[in-house]
């Protein structure tokens, strides 16, 4: 089982445990209220009246807990969570959950003594914090004790050891590769090595040089860890990354529904304009250097790329009249909201390329692999600054802008890029 599959398995396990613990917490909280405020454990009146305050939280409370924990970034790295960071995140999440439940389900209850409101809030927080942290700690502890869930790490010191790792990895997959290279190793060699490792589904880290440590590039997850530069990780915080993904899901789902009439009209125009399918599917390289199938409206004649892949150019005879109009306003990209919803892409991120062109770009810019650390996007800073890329030099320029975006990515920057993209669309600057 690969590292990313194990991460997914562990994420689902934590979500399942959190759902059970949140139900248990709410049940214990109700029992506390019945015993303390009513003087009895169960009562027909308190159980069934009001029904909203009893039945609704059984569904809403676990869902709310999972949403808060997801947005906190708790599920992002289930196999590598420093205990202090996990404790702090659980504490803050428990505060937010307790306050939310208090104002939604508790504050409208008829209470004659207002100190009981405060007592209810404190008890709910304590139950939520302990009821979530203890089960999580047990799951983490047991997972680390099991050999099958112990992260496997391989250290590479030079290019010759890459083949040895590939052979070992094919027999029993590793989770992380640490590059402990000689300080005289050339940058091109390092990037070539990283490009070779990315498709193997492993986390990649580099032992930093003195310069990296002085400039703050090296990071540690725990006081006992070795300082490393995590190549496959990004600059966004876990919370920001989860908010970004939640935003992608919400916006793509809304756009797919609201723009359904436009989707149907465009599909009809493509169908009557030329022979061939409505949609054009093509393999692109995305997150972690893995291939996925991108979806677009077909804007070219059938079999336009039957031989060697080509970049589109001004007055390209392969583009249909309807296709040229759609490209002008970027309408051919609308089906990619399905790619975003599915998790192949993000709204903002480097544009994905075909392997054929990536191989050519890497000859001029061997650091292309650095964009594999995030999902490719519908738009990014590179396409805004460079526009459509009809030459290899423009593709390298776009890559450089995308690298700068990755090093400075934030929710605020994503919003700015989206507004700039809207301006590009309405000005009809596509081609």
What does each model-found stretch correspond to?
Residues 365-431:
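C-terminal terminal-structure detector
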Residues 90, 94, 148-164, 277-300:
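Membrane-cytosol interface motif
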Residues 1-21, 25, 80-82, 135-260:
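N-terminal hydrophobic signal-anchor/signal peptide
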Residues 211-212, 218-220, 279-320, 379-398:
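Short, glycine-rich, amphipathic interfacial segments at transmembrane boundaries or analogous
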Residues 240-304, 339, 411, 416-431:
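A hydrophobic, helix-centered structural microdomain
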Residues 314-375, 417-421, 425:
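A short, structured surface patch at a secondary-structure boundary
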Residues 1-146, 431:
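Signature of alpha-helical transmembrane segments in polytopic membrane proteins
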């Amino acid at each position: 089982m690969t590292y990313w599959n194990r991460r997914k398995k562990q994420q689902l396990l934590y979500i399942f445990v959190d759902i059970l613990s949140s139900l248990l917490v709410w049940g214990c909280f109700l029992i506390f209220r019945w015993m303390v405020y009513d003087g009895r454990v169960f009562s027909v009146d308190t159980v069934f009246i009001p029904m909203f305050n009893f039945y609704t939280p059984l569904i809403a409370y676990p869902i709310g807990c999972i949403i808060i924990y997801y947005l906190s970034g708790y599920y992002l790295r289930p196999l590598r969570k420093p205990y202090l960071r996990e404790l702090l995140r659980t504490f803050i999440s428990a505060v937010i959950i307790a306050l939310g439940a208090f104002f939604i389900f508790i504050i409208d209850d008829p209470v004659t003594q207002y100190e009981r409101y405060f007592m209810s809030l404190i008890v709910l927080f304590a139950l939520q914090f302990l009821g979530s942290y203890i089960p999580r700690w047990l799951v983490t502890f047991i997972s680390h004790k099991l050999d099958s869930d112990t992260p496997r790490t391989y250290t590479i010191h030079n290019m010759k050891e890459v083949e040895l790792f590939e052979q070992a990895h094919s027999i029993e997959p590793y989770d992380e590769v640490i590059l402990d290279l000689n300080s005289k190793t050339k940058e091109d060699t390092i990037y070539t090595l990283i490009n070779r490792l990315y498709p193997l589904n492993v986390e990649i880290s580099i032992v930093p040089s003195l310069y990296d440590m002085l400039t703050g590039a090296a990071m540690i997850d725990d006081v006992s860890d070795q300082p490393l530069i995590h190549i496959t990780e990004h600059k966004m915080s876990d919370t920001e990354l989860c908010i970004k993904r939640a935003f992608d899901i919400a916006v793509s789902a809304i756009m797919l529904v609201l723009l359904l009439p436009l989707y149907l009209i465009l599909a009809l125009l493509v169908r009557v304009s030329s022979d061939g399918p409505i949609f054009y599917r093509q393999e692109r390289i995305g997150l972690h250097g893995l291939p996925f199938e991108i979806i677009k409206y077909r804007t070219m004649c059938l079999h336009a790329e039957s031989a060697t892949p080509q970049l589109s150019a001004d007055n390209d005879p392969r583009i249909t009249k309807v296709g040229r109009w759609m490209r002008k306003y970027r309408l051919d990209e609308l089906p990619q909201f399905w790619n975003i919803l599915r998790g192949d892409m993000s709204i903002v991120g480097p544009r994905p390329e075909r392997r054929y062109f990536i191989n050519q770009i890497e000859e001029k810019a061997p650091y292309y692999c650095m964009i594999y650390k995030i999902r490719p996007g519908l738009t990014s800073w590179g396409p805004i600054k460079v526009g459509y890329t009809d030459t290899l030099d423009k593709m390298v320029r776009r890559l450089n802008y995308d690298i700068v975006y990755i090093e400075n990515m934030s929710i605020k920057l994503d919003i700015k890029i989206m507004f700039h993209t809207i301006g590009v669309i309405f000005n009809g600057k596509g081609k």
